[in-house]
Structures are given as structure tokens and as C-alpha cells.
Amino acid sequence: MAEKLGILGRKVGMTRIFASDGSAVAVTVIQAGPCPVIQVRNGETDGYDAVQIAFEEAKEKHVTKPARGHFAKAGKGLFRNLREIRLEAPAEFEVGQELTVSLFAAGEKVKVTGTSIGKGYQGVMRRWNFAGSKDTHGCEKVHRSGGSIGNNTFPGHVFKGKKMAGHWGDERVTVKNLEIVDIRAEDNVILVKGAVPGPKNGLVLVRKQ
């Protein structure tokens, strides 16, 4: 499925700025780009249309030998992160071209993809907001349990998708319709209204809506 173009960046953290009417706006600071184009794929040779972009320079010892050869074709150095974005018209881009925050404009809506903060193994009360059992009146050792998970004889198994305790977080999450409040092109910084997935210094992909 074709997507809109975007660039990679790091979530610096959250702060607030003041609008012209004096109201405080919570924003996320994203250090984005520059992202050089490493490869342009097309339907004739690759079977699909896409653009590969890179982010954050890396030392040679931290890059595998096959990846070094791949980066060498672009002639832009070695990088830590490589991401492929499927596009409808990748022909307008060329290898070596640098993508910066100038792709976007203040007031534009974007979607941000990142990896949510991992919470480890959690019970149903924290993971799914269950109410839990009674605190007293005969309740013993099951105060935070999830209760019944199904019948015995029939169906005789737990239905797929049943909300139970388990690993929470550390998943790929996309937040849509985030407004760009300001762009600091000289610092490669985008200020996005609201929160984006992931911890501080987490890798994110900012794409046009």
C-alpha cells in the first residue's frame, strides 16, 4: 500500500509554547532529518514503488559489510537507521537527495509512528483497566485477578483475543492527525501538537497525512 513521504527523527521530549492568544500549547519536540535517499525502487525492476531513506551517521564498525556496500552506492556515508517507504510516484526522487523538515509546513497535519514504551508483564487491572474483585467479604487472594476466562465443558477453551495478563507496550504505534505547530529549519526541529509514541530519544517516522 502506497504511503505519503516522511522523514525519520528522534523524539527529544515534550514542552509547551504559547500561542498568539496567550494559550499554552503542549508540543512534542522532534529532531528530524536530514535523511538522504539511499535507493529508489520502481515497479519494473523491483515489483513495487518505494524510497529508502537513512538517518543518523554511524561508524564503520557498527555497520554490517552488506549494508556498507548498499550505502556506498548512494555515496552519502554510513548510517544507523534505514527505512523504506512505499510511494505512488518515487520517480521524482533521486539517490543522494536529502530530505529535511522543509517537506512540511506549520499547520499541516502529520502522522507519527514510533515504538511505545515497554511496561513489561502486567496484570489485567493495569493492562486492560479491569475493576478487580472485592477487597473484603469473603474475597481471598484474587483481589486483582481477571475473574472467569470461559466455561468448562463448553466451549472448553479460552477464546482467542480474551483480555488477560501479559506483556504490555513495546509495540509499533501510529498516531494520526497531529498538527505541526512550528518548524525550526535551522535546527532540523519539528514541534508537533500533543504526544507521540515512544520514550525520549526514541526513533520516530513523521509522514504527511
Curated annotation (Swiss-Prot):
It holds the Pfam family Ribosomal_L3. PANTHER family: 50S RIBOSOMAL PROTEIN L3 (PTHR11229), LARGE RIBOSOMAL SUBUNIT PROTEIN UL3C (PTHR11229:SF16). Coiled coil: none annotated. Belongs to the universal ribosomal protein uL3 family. Part of the 50S ribosomal subunit. Forms a cluster with proteins L14 and L19. This is Large ribosomal subunit protein uL3. Keywords: Ribonucleoprotein, Ribosomal protein, RNA-binding, rRNA-binding. One of its GO terms (biological process) is translation. NCBIfam families: L3_bact. InterPro entries: Ribosomal_uL3, Ribosomal_uL3_bac/org-type, Transl_B-barrel_sf. One of the primary rRNA binding proteins, it binds directly near the 3'-end of the 23S rRNA, where it nucleates assembly of the 50S subunit. GO terms for molecular function: rRNA binding; structural constituent of ribosome. The lineage of its organism: Bacteria, Pseudomonadati, Thermodesulfobacteriota, Desulfovibrionia, Desulfovibrionales. GO terms for cellular component: cytosolic large ribosomal subunit.
